[in-house]
Amino acid sequence: MTDRYILAVESSCDETSVAILKNESTLLSNVIASQVESHKRFGGVVPEVASRHHVEVITTCFEDALQEAGISASDLSAVAVTYGPGLVGALLVGLAAAKAFAWANHLPLIPVNHMAGHLMAAREQKPLVYPLIALLVSGGHTELVYVPEPGDYHIIGETRDDAVGEAYDKVGRVMGLTYPAGREIDQLAHKGQDTYHFPRAMITEDHLEFSFSGLKSAFINLHHNAKQKGDELILEDLCASFQAAVLDILLAKTKKALSRYPAKMLVVAGGVAANQGLRDRLTQEITHIEVVIPKLRLCGDNAGMIALAAAIEYDKQHFANMSLNAKPSLAFDQFPDSFVIN
């Protein structure tokens, strides 16, 4: 059987990435050009800065990915690209590059939802078993997704306000931590105790929705009031208390989803899936079903995950024409108008 190679492009936020996937789940390369240092001084991602950085490095990422994989453009079977959700300017850079490369090399173009990429990153670890439930946790999204079969995604719960990763970054900024703050909060939390009381919004309610704005506000108010009064705050305990509240909410809603849907596997993915506290709680508390979490290198934004999701769409011959456009607010159940079903 002839090997299949998919080149994938990811540029939805502040990482420029190009990867090569061989067949179903073998990543030959996954080149990532991070912009974290450029955005640190702003305390968050500046869309215009992100777009300019993508333009500067994306050609080199293509070259490096092919060289690292040891193949040439003539060996490729398809080109995949993230077309949403994300920052519109950033998405357009990746789309333009992917479309130009696909057109120049006479290759089909596969449109991929960024969040489907996060979910399908778990395929590199082991074959997924369906139906499954996915908890997707990142800086821009917090979602519970039911996946009855490959490529069929149904959101069954999502945040009503802040995403969990966004909450981490905002409380991190209040504490004077470096952006992005998730990893540092996790590390500090392991050294502290859950001594401050923070709300667990909607944790006992029957639905599968999340809310983190109240928790974020409670944290900011506590921190502000203590500073005003000159009270001492123990940073490690603050982080431990905040993280305990976050994990209580995530675990409660995930367990509720597992009790309602006929799942054979739980996938936990997205940037926040790198959180060691979350990984520990999941393995300790969810033992009746297999839990699959992507390796750390595939938790953040990367083109490897886009390639892994694209393999599913390739099998279904879900290709797009060159009118494919960026969809910054793309939902899981949306498909591009430019699909060409062969």
From Swiss-Prot:
GO CC terms: cytoplasm
Keywords of this entry: Acyltransferase, Cytoplasm, Iron, Metal-binding, Transferase, tRNA processing
UniProt cross-references to InterPro entries, sorted A to Z: ATPase_NBD, Gcp-like_dom, KAE1/TsaD, TsaD
Cofactor note: Binds 1 Fe(2+) ion per subunit.
GO molecular function, one term: iron ion binding
Record bears the keyword Transport: no
SUPFAM superfamilies: Actin-like ATPase domain (SSF53067)
Cofactors demanded by this protein: Fe(2+)
Ranges that cross the membrane: none
Residue sites binding substrate per the record: 136-140, 169, 182, 186, 275
Top enzyme class: transferase
Annotated Fe cation binding sites: 114, 118, 301
Localization, UniProt: Cytoplasm
Catalytic activity line of the entry: L-threonylcarbamoyladenylate + adenosine(37) in tRNA = N(6)-L-threonylcarbamoyladenosine(37) in tRNA + AMP + H(+)
Coiled-coil residues: none
Biological-process GO terms, alphabetical: tRNA threonylcarbamoyladenosine modification
The keyword Ligase is assigned to this record: no
Signal sequence interval, chain numbering: none
EC number: 2.3.1.234
Superkingdom of origin organism: Bacteria
Main location: cytoplasm
Similarity section: Belongs to the KAE1 / TsaD family.
Function: Required for the formation of a threonylcarbamoyl group on adenosine at position 37 (t(6)A37) in tRNAs that read codons beginning with adenine. Is involved in the transfer of the threonylcarbamoyl moiety of threonylcarbamoyl-AMP (TC-AMP) to the N6 group of A37, together with TsaE and TsaB. TsaD likely plays a direct catalytic role in this reaction.
PANTHER family in the record: TRNA N6-ADENOSINE THREONYLCARBAMOYLTRANSFERASE, TRNA N6-ADENOSINE THREONYLCARBAMOYLTRANSFERASE, MITOCHONDRIAL
Name of the protein in question: tRNA N6-adenosine threonylcarbamoyltransferase
Organism: Streptococcus pyogenes serotype M2 (strain MGAS10270)
Organism ancestry: Bacteria, Bacillati, Bacillota, Bacilli, Lactobacillales
Gene: tsaD
